[in-house]
Regions:
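Bacterial N-terminal signal peptides that target proteins for export
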Residues: 1-9
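Zinc-dependent metalloendopeptidases
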Residues: 23-263
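Bacterial N-terminal signal peptides
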Residues: 9-19
Length: 263
């Protein structure tokens, strides 16, 4: 079997056959990496279940390495109201963070492949479209293109080379290590592909008790922030903060201001 197994990765990847300390549905961390593929720059966001006794930095560095990427901060991220979004930001020079993706027109159609999914997750994915699309002052919209049989083309675990196919697909893959999911994106030729790890235990209803299960809508909500063009935020009142220990089922006001500033 090829090393690029039938799998789907969009800046999210996890593994059930990992240390029990990483299966508690607890501390989750996220980081962005960069990879060169045939002269093209690809970025990937990894979402990782951090094992007990390990730092978030070490866990995310390992996950990035498994994706063939190295830690990188997009050069356009940061700055008061800045990044690729421009504009003046919020009151008092509030700082926003962007990853270089900016859609023109500001619309994204996302397709879902549920093959090998351990739970019914499409409804949770669609729920996040309402969050990111219905922000006062923002023209950004993301919607469902229905289902697909495609493996997201930018995902490392998919068959063949990592290439742009001008589609934004979401799927599932057997990702390694402690990765819950990945989102790969290319600002130069706007595209974003996502995959979650089939090997973890998930729950589909955000905010409900799930024991050791990880909340799939929380991961989709964070990753679709990256799809919209947002980078990790430096404040905890944001779904884009790169660490959390409890489900996040809706945007914070800061997230709404961030995307309204970009679009």
């Amino acid at each position: 079997m090829t090393s690029r197994r039938f799998a789907y990765v969009l800046s999210l990847a996890i593994l059930l056959a990992l240390p029990a300390s990483a299966q508690a549905g607890g501390h989750v961390a996220s980081a962005t990496g960069v990879k060169q593929v045939k002269g093209k720059t690809l970025y990937v966001d990894v979402v990782v279940a951090v094992p007990a006794g390990e730092t978030a930095r070490h866990a995310t560095d390992r996950a990035l390495s498994e994706q063939g990427a190295s830690r990188a901060k997009p050069p356009w991220a940061g700055g008061p109201g800045g990044g690729s979004g421009g504009g003046g930001g919020g009151g008092g020079g509030e700082q926003y963070f962007y990853n270089g993706l900016k859609w023109s027109p500001p619309t994204v159609t996302q397709n879902y492949n549920g093959a090998n999914a351990p739970i019914a997750a499409q409804t949770a994915l669609i729920n996040t479209y309402s969050d990111w699309s219905n922000v006062t002052g923002s023209t950004y919209r993301i919607s469902s293109g229905g289902t697909t049989t495609r493996c997201p083309s930018l995902v490392k675990e998919c068959p063949g080379a990592q290439v742009n196919d001008a589609r934004n697909d979401v799927g599932w893959a057997g990702l390694g290590g402690t990765t819950l999911g990945v989102t790969w994106f290319t600002p130069s030729s706007p595209e974003a592909d996502m995959a979650l790890n089939t090997l973890f235990t998930w729950k589909s209803t955000c905010g409900t008790s799930g024991g050791s299960a990880y909340d799939v809508e929380t991961v989709f909500l964070h990753e679709n922030g990256h799809v919209a063009g947002l980078d990790h935020a430096n404040r905890t009142d944001s779904v884009m903060y790169p660490s959390y220990q409890a489900p996040r089922c809706t945007l914070f006001d800061y997230d709404r201001r961030s995307i309204a500033n970009l679009y």
